[in-house]
């Protein structure tokens, strides 16, 4: 009797564990009608992924089953796969590659990469939480959209496959039809292509239909409209969407262009965490934590709400506050707001709260970012101007005494664990 009980417990453990074997072992992509399906150990699996390793407990509670990384040593990958096992998730493990085309003619660099890839493949070839290897991320963004680079990606793909027969092999490109055609020409050994796309998400189906590449793909980064794609002020400050506008876009892009595409095996939403890129909030699905004076503790944004809704197909019992707009002196960001040095101004945030909770408003002014990264590389947090203000009022009055380009940030908190965000760029000019 005890043996029978233990047997059924084992079966249940296998059923509910993401990283487990079944009678059919391995990861495969199979043709299905006019698209493709992914099978992990015999189970059809659609990838509901996040970019990054932050708060994976929230990711799984929200319906995610995978996460993506951008690189790592053997020891770092071991830690990553331990995280995956603890959270019952799969990993698309990145392998960092240079964007400098010259290096693809450098034997020393290529030998180094061959050894790194060989060691990774040999070490993790049997790991059941590993989904796929991602060779490089947007290498074509520099000047490496060349045959030599893609031929080396093909060489590394073949090297991995000669060692690791369980896991898939991919590479990741930006939204670049030319790079997609290069992959079709030079890299036939890939199991699927990863593509990072933001604003042109609606063009994805047509792009793949018109491309020479005819295989499966995943959307390996996606999210709000990028700062390079949006409207800017007359002084070139990009205008960021409110968190409510982002929430709507996340849901629309997922349902209309990701899950509805039969060639798409799933996606990794970006960024499941927080980063500085033009602003502290542009791609961040969680807000900052432990910043001096700022009473934020890594709360969830409405984009987390959006993903839970589309992943689970269920409505949430608690939702984020809806920020309708922020104005400065009754003007919107699109109005190219210019203020005078030393003259007080008033900002206002208009909010809808379905649950009628008491709200806390946090106001912060930062200088407009001037130290800018490339391709998502590190950017420092811009300098703060004045003090952070926290109140229960949806209006804020202050004065700037030095000319320059600035951005006013508004955060709306309640007791649900969500925070809604908005910011408006403005310029302060000297009095005539």
Regions found by a protein language model. Give the residues of each.
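Substrate-binding clefts and catalytic carboxylate motifs of secreted carbohydrate-active enzymes
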Residues: 32-33, 40-49, 209-378, 391, ...
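C-terminal motif of bacterial Sec signal peptides marking the signal peptidase cleavage site
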Residues: 17-18
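Active-site mouth of glycoside hydrolases
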Residues: 26, 30-33, 37-190, 196-203, ...
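Residue-level recognition of secondary-structure-to-loop junctions
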Residues: 353, 390, 396-402
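Positively charged n-region of N-terminal signal peptides that target proteins for export
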Residues: 1-5
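C-terminal edge beta-strand
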Residues: 422-429
């Amino acid at each position: 009797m005890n043996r029978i009980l233990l047997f059924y417990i084992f079966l249940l453990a296998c059923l509910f564990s993401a990283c487990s074997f079944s009678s059919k072992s391995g990861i495969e992509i199979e043709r299905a009608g006019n698209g493709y399906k992914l099978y992990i150990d015999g189970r059809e699996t659609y990838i509901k992924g996040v970019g990054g390793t932050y708060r994976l407990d929230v990711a799984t509670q929200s319906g995610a089953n995978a996460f993506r990384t951008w690189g790592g040593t053997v020891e770092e990958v071991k830690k990553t796969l331990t995280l995956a096992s603890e959270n019952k998730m799969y990993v698309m493990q990145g392998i960092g590659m240079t964007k400098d085309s010259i290096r693809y003619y450098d034997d020393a660099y290529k030998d180094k990469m061959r050894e790194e890839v060989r060691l990774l493949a040999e070490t993790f070839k049997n790991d059941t939480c590993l989904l796929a290897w991602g060779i490089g991320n947007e290498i074509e963004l520099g000047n490496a959209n060349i045959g030599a680079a893609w031929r080396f990606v093909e060489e590394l793909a073949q090297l991995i496959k000669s060692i690791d027969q369980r896991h898939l092999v991919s590479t990741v490109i930006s939204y670049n039809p030319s790079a997609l055609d290069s992959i079709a020409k030079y890299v036939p050994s890939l199991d699927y292509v990863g593509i990072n796309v933001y604003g042109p998400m609606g063009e994805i189906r047509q792009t793949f239909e018109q491309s020479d590449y005819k295989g499966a793909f995943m959307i390996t980064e996606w999210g709000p409209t990028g700062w390079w794609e949006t409207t800017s002020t007359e002084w070139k400050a990009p205008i960021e969407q409110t968190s409510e506008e982002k929430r709507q876009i996340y849901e629309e892009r997922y349902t209309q262009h990701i899950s509805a595409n039969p060639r798409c095996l799933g996606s990794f939403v970006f960024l499941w965490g927080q980063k500085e890129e033009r602003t502290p909030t542009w791609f961040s699905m969680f807000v900052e934590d432990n910043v001096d004076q700022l009473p934020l503790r890594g709360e969830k944004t409405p984009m987390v709400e959006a993903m839970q809704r589309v992943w689970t197909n269920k409505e949430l019992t608690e939702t984020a506050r809806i920020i309708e707009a922020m104005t400065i002196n009754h003007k919107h960001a699109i109005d190219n707001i210019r203020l005078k040095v030393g003259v007080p101004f008033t900002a206002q945030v208009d909010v809808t709260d379905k649950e009628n909770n008491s709200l806390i408003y946090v106001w912060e002014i930062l200088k407009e970012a001037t130290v800018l990264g490339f391709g998502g590389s590190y950017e420092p947090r811009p300098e703060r101007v004045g003090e952070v203000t926290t109140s229960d009022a949806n209006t804020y009055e202050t004065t700037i005494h030095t000319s320059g380009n600035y951005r006013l940030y508004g955060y709306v908190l309640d007791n649900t664990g969500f925070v809604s965000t908005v910011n408006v760029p403005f310029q302060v000019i000297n009095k005539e």
